[in-house]
C-alpha cells in the first residue's frame, strides 16, 4: 500500500497525564485503502490515541496529520474521523443498522449510499440482517 497516499500520519506522538505517559512515541502511517485495527491490553493507550485522532485530546508531543493536514487546530466536528465507543451500541435505543448509519447520516450522505455502505459493513463483519 506504500504507493497509495498516506491518509493518516502519526509522528512521535506522546500523551502525558502528569508524569504518566499514556501514549509514548507512537509512529504510524495508514495508507488509502488500508483496513486498520488497534489492539492491545487494557491501559496501553488505545483509547487515548483514538481520542487524539478524534480531537477530544491533544498530543503532549508529536503530530497527527489527516490527509496531510495537521489536526491540532481542527475541531472534532470537522475531522473525517469516527469513533466507536466501548459499548455494543452508540445509541442502545436504535437498531444495529441505525447505529452504523449514524455517522453517515450526520455527514448528510445520500440515503441510497448510506444503505449500501451500511449493508456492506454489516456483511463484512457477518452482522447482515440486523
Residue ranges, per PLM feature:
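Conserved ABC ATPase "signature" region
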Residues: 70, 105-108, 112-130
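The feature captures the beta-strand-to-loop junction immediately N-terminal to the Walker
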Residues: 39-41
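Short coil-to-helix segment of the ABC ATPase nucleotide-binding domain corresponding to the Q-loop/switch region
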Residues: 94-101
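Helix-to-loop junction immediately C-terminal to a conserved catalytic motif
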Residues: 54
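Conserved ABC transporter NBD signature motif
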Residues: 62-70
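Conserved coupling/switch loops of ABC nucleotide-binding domains, chiefly the family-specific signature
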Residues: 60-63, 97, 113
Amino acid at each position: 500500500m506504500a504507493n497509495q497516499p498516506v491518509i493518516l500520519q502519526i509522528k512521535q506522538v506522546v500523551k502525558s497525564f502528569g508524569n504518566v505517559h499514556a501514549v509514548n512515541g507512537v509512529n504510524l502511517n495508514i495508507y488509502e485503502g488500508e483496513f486498520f485495527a488497534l489492539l492491545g491490553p487494557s491501559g496501553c493507550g488505545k483509547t487515548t490515541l483514538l481520542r487524539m485522532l478524534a480531537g477530544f485530546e491533544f498530543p503532549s508531543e508529536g503530530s497527527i496529520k489527516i490527509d496531510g493536514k495537521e489536526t491540532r487546530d481542527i475541531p472534532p466536528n470537522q475531522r473525517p474521523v469516527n469513533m466507536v465507543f466501548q459499548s455494543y451500541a452508540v445509541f442502545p435505543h436504535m437498531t444495529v443498522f441505525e447505529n452504523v448509519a449514524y455517522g453517515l447520516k450526520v455527514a448528510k450522505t445520500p440515503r441510497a449510499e448510506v444503505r449500501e455502505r451500511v449493508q456492506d459493513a454489516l456483511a463484512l463483519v457477518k452482522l447482515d440482517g440486523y
